[in-house]
Amino acid sequence: MKFEVISQIENIEVISVGTDIRNLAYLEKAYGSGRWRKLKGVAHVRLPNGNIRWVELHWYEAHGIGRKNIKIKRYVE
């Protein structure tokens, strides 16, 4: 699903780091090696139909590579 993050991501928590990540081999092959972390947080997003919703997001991040594979996991509001 396409969406646009329109606010700062808040309440960021680390879910897992390094070899604890199931998709680590994919991340390193697609984006390069690094200290990969899986994180979650909440933010306002604009959905394709124009609605703005408060959602929980999950994504992967590595220093020097940035945020990758941002996904909506659930609607908070």
Model-derived features: where do they sit?
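Cysteine-centric segments in proteins
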Residues: M1-E77
